[in-house]
């Protein structure tokens, strides 16, 4: 695989294996005439195979364009395709760009009255066919466009096309991850080593909401089962049977500890009779005269 890039920017065997494992080289049966230079061959079943070498060259070229912009916030990354929502949000969080995940509000680049109005210097889209509204508005206000393009993608108003499979969740996540890593390397934020960036590519992959909810339920059930097991294994609190009994009562444990026999037929010790006619032991003082003026007058 011949490459026109300098040796320091060339793809390593590990990066080529990542692209192949994510099926970034698998195109579609349809092919646009402007995407023909990026096609390597066509399989017997009609699927077009992309040239991985040209994919890497255009990826590095796009990263150099993004790194040349002084303010990272002037870059806007867009994905209306659900598989790219998490990828663009992670890219924006790591590089400082603006992210539009989901529906693109018409007029965001042309109508300054709208609340979502933006003036970026560059936009990066996941699919030119799905993000056509953003590309068209960018053409009205002279904003350059970088796009991940499949073999059937229209290249109208697209300035830099990165040929890749933009319909697979793993391919989209990998391409955004590689682009973010290359931008950070060119900015000097991370070193150009294999372990220079500790963000895993899995963080950029799309996750099904039902799958996430199921995983959270399984984790909650596992925590509940672990808590129930700990509660079952914990020893019960033992009462101190050797403590002194309450007044008028008998402590069987204390009697057994002293070696005596407990006579259950014996009558309990009765308290003395209560004389309700006796005077109270302490004076309440309700009838006493006040010692000093109260100050109410």
Curated annotation (Swiss-Prot):
Disulfide bond residue pairs: none
Molecular function GO terms recorded: structural constituent of ribosome
Subcellular location: Cytoplasm
Keywords tagged on the record: Cytoplasm, Ribonucleoprotein, Ribosomal protein
UniProt entry tagged with the keyword Transmembrane helix: no
Stretches for region Disordered: 265-297
Pfam families: 40S_SA_C, Ribosomal_S2
Biological process (GO), any one: ribosomal small subunit assembly
Predominant location: cytoplasm
A GO CC annotation given for this chain: cytosolic small ribosomal subunit
InterPro entries registered for this protein in UniProt: Ribosomal_uS2, Ribosomal_uS2_C, Ribosomal_uS2_CS, Ribosomal_uS2_euk, Ribosomal_uS2_euk/arc, Ribosomal_uS2_flav_dom_sf
SUPFAM superfamilies: Ribosomal protein S2 (SSF52313)
SUBUNIT field: Component of the small ribosomal subunit. Mature ribosomes consist of a small (40S) and a large (60S) subunit. The 40S subunit contains about 33 different proteins and 1 molecule of RNA (18S). The 60S subunit contains about 49 different proteins and 3 molecules of RNA (25S, 5.8S and 5S). Interacts with RPS21.
Task performed by this protein: Required for the assembly and/or stability of the 40S ribosomal subunit. Required for the processing of the 20S rRNA-precursor to mature 18S rRNA in a late step of the maturation of 40S ribosomal subunits.
Family per similarity comment: Belongs to the universal ribosomal protein uS2 family.
UniProt name for this protein: Small ribosomal subunit protein uS2
Taxonomic lineage of the native organism: Eukaryota, Fungi, Dikarya, Basidiomycota, Agaricomycotina
């Amino acid at each position: 695989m011949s490459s026109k890039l300098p040796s320091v920017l060339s793809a390593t065997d590990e990066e080529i294996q990542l692209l192949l494992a994510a099926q970034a080289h698998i195109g579609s049966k349809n092919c646009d005439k402007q995407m023909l230079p990026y096609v390597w061959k066509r399989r017997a079943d009609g699927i077009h195979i992309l040239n991985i070498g040209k994919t890497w060259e255009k990826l590095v070229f796009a990263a150099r364009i993004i790194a040349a912009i002084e303010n990272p916030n002037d870059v806007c990354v867009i994905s209306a395709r659900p598989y790219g929502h998490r990828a663009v949000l992670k890219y924006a969080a790591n590089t400082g760009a603006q992210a539009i995940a989901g529906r693109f509000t018409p007029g965001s680049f042309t109508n300054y009255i709208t609340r979502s109005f933006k003036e970026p210097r560059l936009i990066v889209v996941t699919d030119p066919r799905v993000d056509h509204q953003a590309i068209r508005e960018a053409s009205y206000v002279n904003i350059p466009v970088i796009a991940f393009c499949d073999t059937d993608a229209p290249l109208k108003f697209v300035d830099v096309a990165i040929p890749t499979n933009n319909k697979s969740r793993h391919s989209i996540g990998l391409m955004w991850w590689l682009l973010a890593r290359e931008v950070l390397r060119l900015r000097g934020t991370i070193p150009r080593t294999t372990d220079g960036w500790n963000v895993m590519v899995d963080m950029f992959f799309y996750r099904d909401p039902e799958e996430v909810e199921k995983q959270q339920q399984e984790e909650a059930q596992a925590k509940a089962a672990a808590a129930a097991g700990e509660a079952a294994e914990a020893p019960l609190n033992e009462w101190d049977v050797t403590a002194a009994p309450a007044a008028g009562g008998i402590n069987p444990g204390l009697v057994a500890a002293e070696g005596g026999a407990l006579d259950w037929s014996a009558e309990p010790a009765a308290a003395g009779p209560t004389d309700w006619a006796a005077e109270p032991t302490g004076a309440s003082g309700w009838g006493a005269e006040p010692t000093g003026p109260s100050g109410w007058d």
